[in-house]
Amino acid sequence: MRIISKERLHHLREKYPVGCRVELLRMDDIQAAVIGTKGTVIGVDVIGSIMVSWDTGSSLSVVFGEDLCRRIDDDK
C-alpha cells in the first residue's frame, strides 16, 4: 500500500467529487468489475481510495496507486 500525501488526497477529492461518474480502467481484485464498467463516486477515503457505487451493484473502491479509473462526466 502506498502512502498518500495530504496534497495528493486533496487533489483526488477535488477531481473525484461525490456524484461524479467514472469508468473502470484497471482493478486487481478477484471480484473486480469488468473493465469499462461505469459508476458514481460516493467519496474518497483517508487513504485515497475512490469509493464507487458501480452500475452493476458492486461497491468496490478504486485503490490509490493500484487500480485505475477515469472521470467520464467531462466527456459530455
PLM ranges: what are they?
Residues 2-76:
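Basic/aromatic-rich interaction segments and small domains that mediate binding to polyanionic partners
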